[in-house]
Curated annotation (Swiss-Prot):
This is Ribonuclease HII. PROSITE patterns: RNASE_H_2 (PS51975). Belongs to the RNase HII family. Manganese or magnesium. Binds 1 divalent metal ion per monomer in the absence of substrate. May bind a second metal ion after substrate binding. PANTHER family: RIBONUCLEASE H2 SUBUNIT A, RIBONUCLEASE HII.
Length: 202
C-alpha cells in the first residue's frame, strides 16, 4: 500500500500545515500536538504514519523534518486534560502547535474527525497520518516530543516505567499504580487512575 503523499494537499493554498497529536490514550502525562509546514521541494524520504515506524527511524526522521520544515509543538497539561477532558485538551494542544509555527498557514489539515474551534481555514482528515505527508510529519514530531517528555518524567517519578510504556495502561503500569498510587502526572479523570486517587503519591 502506498504511503502518505501530497495528493490530498495540492488542492489547498500554501503555506499548508499538517497537524496531529500524540498521547490521547495514556493514563499519565500531557497530550502533545505538532504542526508541520513542509517545503515540497525538500521532503525527507521515508515519512510515514508514526505508528508504522520503528523508534530509530522515527527519531531520525524527526530530526530531518525539523531541519527543513516549519515546526510548532503544543502541549495540554494533565491539569487541563482533567479539567476540560482529553478531546478538548487535544484540540487545545493543536491550537498551540499551530500558534507556535512562527508562520501563519493559509490552510490546516488536521488528523481525525474534527478541527479545533478556531477561525483559520482547516479541514479534518480521517486517517490523515497515513494519507497526507504534512500530517504524517506532524505525527512523527508529536510522538517523538511526547516520548522524550515521558522519559524525562520517568527520571523524576520512578517506578511507573514511563520511559518504556509512555504512560499507557500496561499491566506493569497498572500494577505500579496500585502499589504506589497516582503521581502528580497521572490523569485523575481517567477511570483506572480515579480508583486510586484517594491515595495520592507523594
Amino acid at each position: 500500500m502506498a504511503g502518505p503523499s501530497f495528493d490530498l494537499e495540492i488542492a489547498h493554498p500554501l503555506p499548508l500545515a499538517g497537524v496531529d497529536e500524540a498521547g490521547r490514550g495514556p493514563l499519565a502525562g500531557p497530550v502533545v500536538a505538532a504542526a508541520v509546514i513542509l517545503d515540497r521541494g525538500r521532503v525527507p524520504a521515508g515519512i510515514d504514519d508514526s505508528k508504522k515506524l520503528g523508534a530509530e527511524a522515527r527519531a531520525d526522521l524527526c530530526g530531518k523534518i525539523r531541519e527543513v520544515a516549519h515546526v510548532g509543538v503544543g502541549i495540554a497539561t494533565v491539569e487541563e486534560i482533567d479539567e476540560i477532558n482529553i478531546l478538548w485538551a487535544s484540540m487545545l494542544a493543536m491550537e498551540r502547535a499551530v500558534a507556535a509555527l512562527g508562520v501563519e498557514p493559509a490552510m490546516v489539515l488536521v488528523d481525525g474527525n474534527r478541527c479545533p474551534r478556531w477561525t483559520r481555514p482547516s479541514q479534518w482528515v480521517i486517517g490523515g497520518d497515513a494519507l497526507c505527508l504534512s500530517i504524517a510529519a506532524a505525527s512523527i514530531v508529536a510522538k517523538e516530543e511526547r516520548d522524550r517528555m515521558m522519559a524525562d518524567y520517568d527520571v523524576h517519578h520512578p517506578g511507573y516505567g514511563w520511559a518504556k510504556n509512555k504512560g499507557y495502561g500496561t499491566p506493569a503500569h497498572l500494577d505500579a499504580l496500585a502499589r504506589l498510587g497516582p503521581s502528580p502526572l497521572h490523569r485523575r479523570s481517567f477511570a483506572p487512575v480515579a480508583q486510586f486517587s484517594l491515595f495520592p503519591a507523594a
